[in-house]
Amino acid sequence: MQDSVFRIESEYVPRGDQPEAITQLSDNIRAGVAHQVLLGVTGSGKTFTMAHTIERCQRPALILAPNKTLAAQLYNEFRALFPHNAVEYFVSYYDYYQPEAYVPTSDTYIEKDSSINDNIDKLRHAATHALLTRRDVIIIASVSCIYGLGSPEYYAKMVIPVEAGQHMSMDSLIGRLVDVQYERNDYDFHRGTFRVRGDVLEVIPAYHHERALRLEFFGDEIDSIKEIDPLTGNVLGDVGKTVIYPASHYVSDRDNLNRAVSDIREELRLRLEEYRQGNRLVEAQRLEQRTMLDLEMIEEMGYCTGIENYSRHLDGRTAGEPPACLLDYFPDNFILFVDESHITVSQVGAMYKGDRSRKQTLVDFGFRLPSALDNRPLEFSEFEKRLNQVVYVSATPSRWELDRSEGIVVEQIIRPTGLLDPLTEVRPTKGQMEDLMTECRSRTARDERVLVTTLTKRMAEDLTEYLTSMGVSARYLHSDIDTMERMAIIQALRRKEFDVLVGINLLREGLDIPEVSLVAILDADKEGFLRSTGSLIQTFGRAARNVDGRVIMYADSVTRSMTAAMQETERRREKQRLYNEEHGIEPVSVRKSLETPFDTLYSDARSAAAKGRGKGRGRQAAPAQTAAEDTTAYGISAEELGGLIQRLEREMRESARDLEFEKAAELRDRIRMLRERLLQQD
């Protein structure tokens, strides 16, 4: 176990409220305080404060973010601050995920369909590898960290230590690699595979892309181990000894597999008896056929498709016992920082019930054994039991966090840059489009950027089309766009590939775009989740990293939420102004590098974003072409709409025949949407 020291490398030092906040947080952690709140305004450097707290306490940390976009941003920042420590990224590796489901009313079974991002899968393996091999670890994670992952005990038990001079035959090593789910591939050499050439075996570990291991044998002895470039074969260095970690988190030794198979067979026997006694013969046949096929695969290969549904048996857990997850890989003294806690905490609490409802139907109708219910995210109470010390980080903490921390709130109002909270004003909705166009052109003339928030995806897409048609370079951002492309779009905005970004709630929490000087909020007087006091304050904050930051709310009335948000913003502005006057500080805009360590992960997505086309499913960031094409469908007759659907269906079938499944899936989703419009017209 490597015991390195957390060490920040930065040209900046804590300023404003940061030094006091770092001291208070660190002292509370050392004193054993279990829960505390860091209430920091947008742009006050909460990430920098978290980093210095970690450095001062010298403990492993988990940073829990509300979505992949913010997790990626935090990953960039912590990697830059801790270049010599293990900063890793752990989010869902699905670019697209359609869970297995059954709809009893229509007798429709929906098979699991997914697309795994290989880069993110590698980063997940790198995260667990780091946790098991060193102590200077910071993991940036989404709510994916509470989902079942496979037992850390079995994962660590199945590692393969290798050393130059070790007595081990090549056949023995090949067998062990296959046991931990590496695949032999002598032609397509990639992560998680190995190849053999004479007395040389080369393997790319699951947590690497750019480096491979070359093991040279002399008889039944490992003669040498070298690190090589998998593409060129060039030797990068000699390795005296190393450890090869499994290619999957769901691994187990043969004895445990045999025990698990026996347990699964017994559960199947009992379940079949129950179905047959109730004369549910269809369910019995379905369950027996599916389960026996899975068991055959497990016995022959050591795994099967959907093996996670048998994780309770593989882990040796009892019914109802929670699964192992990323939290179980951490040492007991780790610190949890819940970023944007006002939304992240509720996310954690919501995961279990949604998952349970879907799987219960599968179990009831014979698609899965009851043990599949234990392949699940943690319940909130189980999540809390796994925590040691927690810091809730938010500009607008909810009542739950404030109560949980029992009044231990560390405030961070003064920004290191001297920036004040943005000026806010309310303008009438009459003529708002013309006014917005004028403001956008004014900002772009000064090489600044604009964020516009709407209430719905359709409004975001239509507004983007309108702005584009009027000569304003604009794109939209919402939840239909996959993770990597979201990051690419944000980077493209910063690089001035376009000037105006239109979105919904994705533009609220945490997005760090210092080039933005104007945030325009449409329908600001529509009370609700997206226009609550907390949401408005968060949205205001997107303009708080620029010295010329301003917020314009378009509304015909001023709601209580608007009033409260403006009053709180003015209170903070006054406190910040007085501090600047007292210390002779001149506000300056935040400066942030455009290049990030995460660039390699979304370079393809950036290319797609620049073209206005996405790699993911459904309607992506293709605002000018796709949105325009779909929008015109509203104005055509039912007959023409039917013709358009038929044309798209032909394209979908052709794409499927050509194995262009992503394109086929995108066309399928557009066809569904057009059919809904056709029904509305009827």
Curated annotation (Swiss-Prot):
One of its GO terms (molecular function) is DNA binding. Residues 432-594 form the Helicase C-terminal domain. Residues 642-677 form the UVR domain. It comes from the Bacteria. One of its GO terms (biological process) is nucleotide-excision repair. One of its GO terms (cellular component) is excinuclease repair complex. The keyword Transit peptide does not apply. A motif (Beta-hairpin) lies at residues 93-116. Belongs to the UvrB family. PANTHER family: UVRABC SYSTEM PROTEIN B (PTHR24029:SF0). This is UvrABC system protein B.
